Amino acid sequence: SIEDCETIKAYINEGIVAGVNKKHLPSCRTPWYSMEQKAVAPIWVSSACRNGIKFVRNLAGAKSLTTFHSVFVHGDFADDVDVIFSYFLTPIAQTIIRENRKELGNGLEKFQPNDLNAANMLNISVITEDDRTKIINIYNEIVLDNRSALLDELNTIFLSYLQ
């Protein structure tokens, strides 16, 4: 156990002396030195980018690294994760989401979690069943073969709901 290991105790004490236990993230954990307990997110988004926001569909159910923010879908839309992910891939969604970003040197765009939370989102409940089927079919093709023509087709469908 942790009490039996003097080197671990000394290491934890160094953290206390340095004030690590008072910093925001560690102070929210019990005990403060434990690993962050994070739920598995179905979609990840890169925290920084230069040429388009990177979205990852977490099909493996892995926990994300710190280079990604987690996107959790409200329970009412749990069956629509692939539709939502498809929307995020489109140029129109990228344009809308980029309105809430900070730009750093050399064109690096940085996103904080609240930047993403504040971004406008298409109300996907207005999408017809016919378009949902098209979107899912395109999504399934993208999973197998990432072609820009498929993204153009997705963009056209979603753009029709934003006009």
Regions found by a protein language model. Name each.
Residues 1-141, 151:
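Polybasic, glycine- and aromatic-enriched phosphate-binding surface used to engage nucleic acids
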